[in-house]
Design a protein with these regions (language model features):
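A short, sequence-level motif marking secondary-structure junctions
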Residues: 51-53, 71-76, 103-106, 189-194
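Beta-sheet-dominated interaction scaffolds and their linkers
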Residues: 94-105, 126
Length: 305
């Protein structure tokens, strides 16, 4: 995970309407705005196996969107979004920063961190707006979700997941989609949430002076009754997840090219990173990797490849 304070790579500076950010891991990909929000009605979302399992994911502080500052993407499947809360009345600047650490892979994990740089504790409400429409990937890409004749029914329910003895229990929001034999779903786990209702996760937060508060939201897909565990789990080190370990091993094995031509060096390095990002793996033979094409919308092996 990149540390925005010490990061030395490229950083996207954001203002209103910042550009899109795309994260990919095999058949999972997420497209959001530059501030990190997945906005309802846009050609954005979290996709798994050609289905949009998350059509909205927006973080609000006290009912308002934070001001985006930067986005850092140093891996194909992870990004950090940095923003700040609106200044308090009578103050020229804000003392509350928001860091959203996102990882995708067979679902999504998002850690939300609030850091208070002020000398007084800050009380605020964190709302996460969520929705799932299970739209077909092609309908989203072509902007015809509303006219897609293959609509099914979506039901929602809130579930309480009890503690296993090692931590606190959590609330989960479950969306289920049915259309004939097609059965899709998604579970959104929100440990520490004060309230969970369809479309909304609410956290009541006190951030101590010169301190921080954090929570982690975990999104897992369901296909034909099978629940897929996200590759990145809340509470587990991200560097131990399979995509991170595979990419680290790839980077160790890539040949080093020594040249005094800076452009050639940059092209070779970029090509190696792209090849590492485009690899897909057979679940039955995980040691076998092939390079796909068409990321993110058509991440598969084409005949011409």
């Amino acid at each position: 995970m990149a540390d925005p304070w010490n990061y030395a790579g490229p950083v996207t500076q954001l203002g209103p309407g910042g550009g899109a950010v795309t994260l990919v891991d095999e058949s999972t990909f997420a497209i959001s705005g530059g501030a990190g929000d997945i906005t309802a009605g846009a050609a954005q979302g979290l996709f798994f196996r050609d289905t949009r399992i998350l059509s909205q994911f927006e973080v609000l502080l006290n009912g308002n969107r934070a001001e985006p500052l930067a986005a850092v993407t140093d891996d194909p499947f992870s990004a950090t979004f940095v923003a700040r809360d609106a200044p308090a009345p009578g103050r020229a600047d804000s003392t509350l920063m928001v860091f959203r650490h996102r990882h995708v892979g067979q679902g999504m994990r998002e850690e939300v961190v609030l850091r208070n740089f002020g000398d007084e504790a800050t009380v605020c409400s964190v709302d996460v707006l969520v929705d799932a429409d299970f739209a077909d990937l092609f309908a989203v890409k072509e902007g015809r979700v509303d006219s897609d004749p293959r609509h099914g029914s979506v039901t929602t329910r809130v579930e309480e997941h009890l503690s296993d003895g090692e931590g606190e229990g959590s609330l989960a929001l479950n969306y289920t989609y049915s259309r004939g034999p097609v059965d899709r779903g998604v579970e959104i786990h929100a440990p520490g949430a004060k309230r969970v209702t369809p479309g909304l996760l609410t956290f009541e937060v006190v951030v101590p002076a010169r301190g921080e508060w954090s929570t982690c939201v975990e999104i897992g897909p369901i296909i034909d009754g099978r629940v897929f565990a996200p590759k990145y789990r809340c509470g587990e080190p991200v560097e131990r997840a399979t995509p991170s370990e595979r990419l680290a091993e790839w980077r160790r094995q890539v040949p080093l090219v020594e040249t005094d031509h800076p452009l050639l060096k940059q092209v070779v390095a970029r090509s190696a990173e792209d090849l590492g990002a485009l690899r897909i793996f057979d679940p039955d033979f995980p040691e076998r990797a092939v390079v796909a094409a068409g990321a993110p919308w058509f991440m598969t092996v084409f005949g011409r490849d």
